[in-house]
């Protein structure tokens, strides 16, 4: 099984280009099932989860063509959903990726029936699917859970309705939003997720002919249409990848510019980096961070739904606090079991104390390289970041987690001056 070896001690300098957002491209690919003509998606990142989604669309009968493109143009995927023949998403594909549940709403709305295996994917605690189920039931769906499958049917078109999410759910919002697009009448979603990836999905649906207002706010209003046509959409840049590279620069005392970024989606992260002592300069599509060779200051943070601090950046900032000056307190309010990287960071010499959903991190002058194991996607990134500043070699096992969400991370870090390589 492949591993990554990081040799610490190099400050990062230079420029890096950000890929399309993992958490936007997956629902957008699923949304192509709603159309009755080919849909082209561009700025698609090379990620394992994208490959899994393409396999799932193909399994349903869609014709999928991948254009690898160029470094400047990026990768694009053309989905022709007119050849879809069945509406069952099997366990073999769904078990590896939680986002597979995002075909439920589109299949139900387009074909009146859908069967989707209960999802697998990340091992970071409870991610309930009840928000998806109750939201679709509010649109008139008949849903049962039998033998590990969510089985959904509708008598004719779904009917517009009002649904208040019990809790903010990004994928729940996306699933119900996609279904509502082809429902009869008006749908109002309250307490909807406001993440930029939800807005990007809505922008894609609008480009195909949907009528949606309020995406990016807690209330989304959808006027159902009879059909969606074909079209094109470019996926927005990945704000979590952007944040990860900025934290890497901050931890190493370096100076890095990230291009093809969207700093307007990163306010909470940029605020914390400024608090840590970084000088940050932004344009519409770039962020420059300069630490002037200084050690970062410890920061306190609490994860919460957008526009607050993202849970997907928690592990990276924990790594930063491990080598920062002072004590940082991290509160994780979104997912349980999202401190699984703590034990691995301790192996590198970090000083972390966990009390329930809170981690208290006392910054150390230095970390020492050691063999560690990735437990989930963002944890694997935090271990690479810690390895960048640890003495000697840090060998990270089970990096298949990393390939689910970061495109060519070792090449990108290497271009900034990191000593990093992948070994068999």
From Swiss-Prot:
Annotated active site: 122 (proton donor)
Please report the name of this protein according to its UniProt entry: UDP-N-acetylglucosamine 1-carboxyvinyltransferase
The record's principal subcellular location, in a coarse class, is cytoplasm
One Gene Ontology term of the biological-process aspect is: cell wall organization
Q: Where does UDP-N-acetyl-alpha-D-glucosamine bind?
A: 98, 127-131, 312, 334
Q: Which reaction does it catalyse?
A: phosphoenolpyruvate + UDP-N-acetyl-alpha-D-glucosamine = UDP-N-acetyl-3-O-(1-carboxyvinyl)-alpha-D-glucosamine + phosphate
User: PTM 2-(S-cysteinyl)pyruvic acid O-phosphothioketal: at which residues?
Assistant: 122
Which EC number(s) are documented for this chain? Answer: 2.5.1.7
PANTHER family annotated for this entry? UDP-N-ACETYLGLUCOSAMINE 1-CARBOXYVINYLTRANSFERASE
Quote the cellular component terms of the Gene Ontology held in the record. Answer: cytoplasm
Pfam families listed in its UniProt record: EPSP_synthase
By which gene is this protein encoded?
Answer: murA
Task: Name the UniProt key words of this record, in alphabetical order.
Answer: Cell cycle, Cell division, Cell shape, Cell wall biogenesis/degradation, Cytoplasm, Peptidoglycan synthesis, Pyruvate, Transferase
Q: List where in the cell it is found.
A: Cytoplasm
Q: Which NCBIfam families match?
A: murA, PRK09369.1
Could you tell me which InterPro entries the record lists for this protein? Enolpyruvate_Tfrase_dom, Enolpyruvate_Tfrase_sf, MurA_subfamily, RNA3'P_cycl/enolpyr_Trfase_a/b, UDP_GlcNAc_COvinyl_MurA
Which of this chain's residues are annotated to bind phosphoenolpyruvate?
22-23
Question: What does the record give as its pathway?
Answer: Cell wall biogenesis; peptidoglycan biosynthesis
Query: According to its UniProt record, which protein family does this protein belong to?
Result: Belongs to the EPSP synthase family. MurA subfamily.
Q: What does this protein do?
A: Cell wall formation. Adds enolpyruvyl to UDP-N-acetylglucosamine.
- Keyword Ion transport present in the record's keywords: the answer is no
According to its UniProt record, this protein's enzyme class is: transferase
Molecular-function GO term, any one: UDP-N-acetylglucosamine 1-carboxyvinyltransferase activity
């Amino acid at each position: 099984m492949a591993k990554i070896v990081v040799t610490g001690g190099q400050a990062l300098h230079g420029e890096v280009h950000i890929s399309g957002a993992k958490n936007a491209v997956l629902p957008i690919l699923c949304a192509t099932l709603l159309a009755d003509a080919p849909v082209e998606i561009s700025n698609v990142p090379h990620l394992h989860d994208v490959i899994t989604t393409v396999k799932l669309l193909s399994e349903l009968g869609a014709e999928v063509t991948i254009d690898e493109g160029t470094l400047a143009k990026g990768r694009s995927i053309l989905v022709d959903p007119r050849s879809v023949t069945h509406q069952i998403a099997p366990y073999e594909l769904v078990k590896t990726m939680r986002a597979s549940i995002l075909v439920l709403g589109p299949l139900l709305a387009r074909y009146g029936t859908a069967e989707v295996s209960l999802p697998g994917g990340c091992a970071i605690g409870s991610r309930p699917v009840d928000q998806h189920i109750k939201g679709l039931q509010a649109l008139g769906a008949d849903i049962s859970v039998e033998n590990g499958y969510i089985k959904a049917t509708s008598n004719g078109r779904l009917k517009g309705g009002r649904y208040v999410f019990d809790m903010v759910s990004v994928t729940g919002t996306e699933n119900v939003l996609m279904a509502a697009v082809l429902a009869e009448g008006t749908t109002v979603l309250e307490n909807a997720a406001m993440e930029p990836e939800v807005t990007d999905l809505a922008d894609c649906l609008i480009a195909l002919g949907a009528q949606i207002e309020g995406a990016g706010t807690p209330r989304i209003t959808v006027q159902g249409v009879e059909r969606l046509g074909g079209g094109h959409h470019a996926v927005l840049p990945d704000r979590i990848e952007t944040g990860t590279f900025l934290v890497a620069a901050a931890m190493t005392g370096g100076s890095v510019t990230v291009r093809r970024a969207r700093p307007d989606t990163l306010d909470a992260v940029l605020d914390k980096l400024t608090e840590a002592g970084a000088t940050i300069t932004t344009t519409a599509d770039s962020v420059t961070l300069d630490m002037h060779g200084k050690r970062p200051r410890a920061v306190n943070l609490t994860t919460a739904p957008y526009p607050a601090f993202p849970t997907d950046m928690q592990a990276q900032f924990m790594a930063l606090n491990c080598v920062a000056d002072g004590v940082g307190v991290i509160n994780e309010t979104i997912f349980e079991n999202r401190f699984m990287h703590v034990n691995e960071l301790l192996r590198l010499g970090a000083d972390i104390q966990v009390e329930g959903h809170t981690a208290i991190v006392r910054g150390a002058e230095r970390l020492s390289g050691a063999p560690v194991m990735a437990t989930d996607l963002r944890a694997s990134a935090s271990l690479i970041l810690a390895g960048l500043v640890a003495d000697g070699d840090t060998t990270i096992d089970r990096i298949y987690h990393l390939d689910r969400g970061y495109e060519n991370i070792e090449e990108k870090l290497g271009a900034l001056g990191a000593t990093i390589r992948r070994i068999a």
